[in-house]
């Protein structure tokens, strides 16, 4: 079962790592495809008009060429142009001289007027190749205009005739304008569809990213829950052990301590026997203290709740360690926060928590350093931070820092922070640690203003 659970956890972690990459890759590929295809419909609609315009221009040139060979009058050529301009979608069809004066126009009333000024004709500079542009007509409607030089003079094998000299001497330009509403509609449709698709892709991408972080958070919370369950199971085991150990060890310890004091009183002061008896008594006290701490860790915690002024409590707790801190030239810093609300807590237990953190900080600093305490309102509770300038905690030790019997010091039982964690938890709060090795540590407590009493057995 454990192997299967580990396999599922490994698969979940692998999927949580690889799925976002796959989704982002697919979304990116789809987005590139959408962007690459953008404008194809518009280009196709525009190409259709360009081909149609080219055919009409060549047809007019061909008709004019045949007409010149047959000495067709200008009125007949004008009629030919008007006939061709009747094609669907044609807004106007015109031939101008190099100054922009209209020679022929689909609207005969425009003949002799200026289609474009000489300056505009110089800018347009009609050549042998057809050129297109998007403009707005006089009525504000979009049109696609195609223009180039008007070349009705020659076809393959055709010789210039005398009556054609007037056409050769006067360069002319031909303009044909199509209704561009289809192109505009295609552009709007493509833009709208592209925006919808990109928005959908962005939504999928955002949902994937959020799901990734949510799932990682879920895995982490599940891991924390599993760790907490293991810790509680360990505490239960310690409770059973402590119940037996306390009875079996404390009675012999009392006898050993009594005998040690008896021998110390009987032995000559300063002698070896006297010193050994004192060592026995001290070790008996130390072992008794370890048993007491073990019992305190695992036994149900009874909280004597009352309204607590944190400013007063923190100042009082700092005074208790001030002498030890002064001896080591360690500064204790705390500025009272008048905006702090009173909280429901057990002042003795809370003082025990702070003292434990202070003493750990003093031991981590050794000599010459600073311990800073801050308190502030945080949501529906208060936050207390204890920061020291000590040697810090290694990254691989942070997760186990609240585990019973885990210690980074040569001395100590490793139960102090476990007791702190237990007391804070019984208050309905949380405790976190942040540290960089060699740069000190910060323990942050969060305690609710009003707590819900917990069943000590739970």
Swiss-Prot record:
Keyword Phosphoprotein among UniProt keywords: yes
Keywords, in A-Z order: ATP-binding, Cell inner membrane, Cell membrane, Kinase, Membrane, Nucleotide-binding, Phosphoprotein, Stress response, Transferase, Transmembrane, Transmembrane helix, Two-component regulatory system, Zinc
Catalysed conversion reaction: ATP + protein L-histidine = ADP + protein N-phospho-L-histidine
Residue positions, PTM Phosphohistidine: 247
The EC number(s) this enzyme carries: 2.7.13.3
Sequence ranges on the Cytoplasmic membrane side: 1-14, 216-458
Cited Pfam families: HATPase_c, HisKA
Protein name: Sensor histidine kinase ZraS
